[in-house]
Amino acid sequence: MDYEASVGLSRKQIRLIAKYFRKMFEIKTILFPVMTVLELLVNKFSNVLYYSVEDDDDFEYGVMATLVENIEDNESMYCIRIKNSVYDDAIKGDGASLGFICHEMCHFVLIHILGIGPKIYINTNGIAYTRVIEPRSLPLFKSMEWQAKALCGEVMIPYEKCKDHTLEQIVKETNSSVEQAKFFLKNVAKNE
């Protein structure tokens, strides 16, 4: 499931947002400490963000974590819901689990901090709505999922510091998953 973003973003724009995200929490190392930043992000935005670690059975198949918006009294409150097993594995340093959590944090940064939420449509009756888009049916730069995935990649594997690294160096120094590091080398570092 995907939504069309209200603003399209290029890889270079996302890279700048990643630098801003890291700077917001004074992260100067190659390693992005996802679990520490999760706590810092929740503390910094405690009036609109919290996270919840929940039973694995409470999630649909294939969902590891998700950002949920609850609106009460015209006020938005966001919750990063995290599978218990994903949270436990992230605490142990599992790169994939850290990536799942970071991805949801990136959705929050894009939607709440930068205001890049789903594109709003208004029908002839004046009713506003968003459209659920089939995966891969949008140009990447307009996909909210791609934007969050790209931002997560840029935050966890900083391009300028890792562009000349080997797969092993990236995994070791960034604590990202092997799959994420392979994607970076094949699709990001190679094409820049």
Language-model features, listed with the residues they occupy:
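Active-site hotspot residues in diverse enzymes, especially metal/ion-binding acidic/histidine motifs
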Residues: 1-192
